[in-house]
Amino acid sequence: MIDGKTIAITRSKDDAEEFIELISKHNATPITLPTIELVSKGEKIVDEFLETIEKESPDFSVFMSSKAVTLLIDSAKSISKFEDLQLAIANTTVIAVGPKTKDALERENIKVAHMPQRYSSVGVGEVFTKLNAVGKTTII
């Protein structure tokens, strides 16, 4: 089906490897064109996250990327606010977009309550539908 075609992979270099292998295996030519780069906001992101949780008391915390989890956790650790972050997240129902994100959270002893079958924002929406989350608040 993709034999002989050229396929653009818009993931970061780290995330592109599995797609490069898969595309090459099917006799297509992969081209890596990373379109998104996550850049840490430093301690600001941790403070904003904690302030939002304190002010809004969200029912759910949704994590859409293992890299974003790592940036948030590493930033919290660097400013000695990791335990505050863990506690704040623990007071919400945690949803991870996929297995890599779930693993990143669980490595830090953050319990993931839900993970969609489809690893995308659509899948997260389906989780909310199943949970009948109408009127609930969420931090993403």
Model region roles, listed by residue range:
Residues 1-140:
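Conserved beta-alpha
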